[in-house]
């Protein structure tokens, strides 16, 4: 039996106070869904199986280019991060895996595995870092990494990615995510074609080191840290990379890495259709790559993304098995609370998408009834699925209200007393 950090008594007490209302709400929603030909228990069962990974760096306090304001009880190392992730998993029952970032989370792999298994956690995709310089690094990535003009720097970046794979093999991970900051700030600074060719050559060396049962995820981003051009700037370039590398290379979609107002759900559909959707980094944004909490700004867009995912799931799309992870920066909130709510919002979008009357939708589409087609989607989106999500948590041992239970447990105050306070502000995302 896995250990838990929040006491069972606290969880049970909070659940007991909320259970009668939840049961009434669940029964009421069940009756309404039954009139639509939907079995609420079947939807709940699917929600219970849905999972999203927590990024190790997400449990720390985030920042911006201008400042970072330390939070109380920040994790001191990866082992503190694992404990924070265990709290999220315990209360939401939706986040059973942690995604590590190397070298930020570098430690003895066997010790890491033991620490995670203590709380019933596993490890999701490994994340390499060639967008900043490590303390003991020989060559700098200031002017690029996998696309750098210097062969030695490219080789160093390749070796780092291969090291991430080796660490991941011990941990039981099955994927490597590669995001680079390579690009330029001025016209003429780099030759677009040569830089991309160097990147492809380097990534082929990384792909060659991939175990047979692993996947390689490449992540595109329109801008930042480079502001004139980025080597892997959009889904078109990302798709070319995945096609060039091989069958185990896929495109990873971060919801904040696109130009404003881009139709992300259509990009998702295209990548599914051509069997190159690897997975997601869920977050939300208003202006750019804001890394805000998932569903906090545009929950309808999140629903529309999941509408495409559920459509692929139900139609049995070939090779469809996307990875799900949160990727956020928490500057003014408790990271644990934000990550719990974000995991729930991702589940919410999934549950709502499961309610879409797909037979009716297809009929309206084929009949060119634009109004009723969009109303069919809106009918699912407007349905309050909170009772389904809460009941799923209750049935699997989680908290009906994760944030209220977390606050009642006093976890943040406890770790703030144990972990030395970080003093002084700084700039930087993490």
From Swiss-Prot:
**Is tRNA processing one of the keywords UniProt gives this record?**
no
- Keywords linked to the UniProt accession: Isomerase, Manganese, Metal-binding
MF terms (GO), sorted A to Z: isomerase activity; metal ion binding
Under InterPro entries, the record lists: L-rhamnose_isomerase, L_rhamnose_iso, Xyl_isomerase-like_sf, Xyl_isomerase-like_TIM-brl
EC no. given is: 5.3.1.-
**Residues passing through the membrane, by range:** none
What general EC class does the enzyme of this chain belong to?
isomerase
The organism's place on the tree of life at top rank: Bacteria
* Chain positions recorded as Mn(2+) binding sites: 257, 289, 291
Q: Which SUPFAM superfamilies match?
A: Xylose isomerase-like
**Which cofactor is essential here?**
Mn(2+)
Q: Which PANTHER family match?
A: L-RHAMNOSE ISOMERASE (PTHR30268:SF0)
Q: Which family does it belong to?
A: Belongs to the rhamnose isomerase family.
What is the designated name of this protein? Probable sugar isomerase mlr5709
Question: From which source organism is this entry?
Answer: Mesorhizobium japonicum (strain LMG 29417 / CECT 9101 / MAFF 303099) (Mesorhizobium loti (strain MAFF 303099))
Taxonomic lineage = Bacteria, Pseudomonadati, Pseudomonadota, Alphaproteobacteria, Hyphomicrobiales
